[in-house]
């Protein structure tokens, strides 16, 4: 037999059950977030712990520079590596060892690492400028010159955008 008191008690139990489920989900998310935060972040490694492709890039294009720091960033979705040289140059590699970004703030970018079509364009249009930063996004490139000009190249290495 249903009465007012039994209906009110059932509603209270349902509210309590929902509150318990919400609290459990909140605590689960909190624990998962803590785990993810603890398992990500930078860790110092040695050059020999870099992927072989990254080691080859350094040996071929940056052999005259001394490494002062190598880090592995265990991101949530992927990992990356960063190599810092004693002259301030920095290379960032993806998880496979392919370079993603090269910064040469006070030195000349190694010519052999710059795609030939990009080199030719820069020699023709910006003959006195040096590349300070170069990024690679798949087959697309972006360069930043010492005069502040940024140039984006498409996958065929044609100029797509110039920012002054």
Predicted regions and their residues:
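Interaction-mediating elements
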Residues: 40-164
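Bacterial Sec-dependent N-terminal signal peptides
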Residues: 5-42
């Amino acid at each position: 037999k249903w009465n007012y008191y039994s209906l009110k008690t059932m509603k209270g139990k349902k509210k309590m059950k929902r509150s318990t489920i919400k609290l459990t989900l909140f605590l689960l998310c909190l624990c998962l977030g803590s785990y993810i935060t603890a398992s990500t972040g930078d860790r110092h490694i040695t050059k020999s712990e870099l992927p072989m492709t990254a080691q080859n890039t350094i040996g071929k294009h940056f052999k005259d520079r001394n490494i002062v720091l190598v880090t592995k960033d265990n991101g949530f979705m992927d990992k990356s590596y960063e190599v810092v040289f004693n002259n301030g140059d920095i290379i960032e590699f993806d998880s496979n060892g392919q370079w993603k970004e090269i910064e040469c703030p006070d030195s000349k970018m190694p010519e052999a690492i710059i795609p030939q079509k990009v080199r030719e364009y820069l020699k023709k249009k910006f003959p006195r400028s040096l590349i300070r930063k170069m990024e690679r996004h798949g087959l697309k490139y972006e360069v930043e010159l010492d005069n502040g000009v940024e140039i984006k190249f498409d996958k065929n290495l044609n100029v797509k955008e110039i920012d002054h």
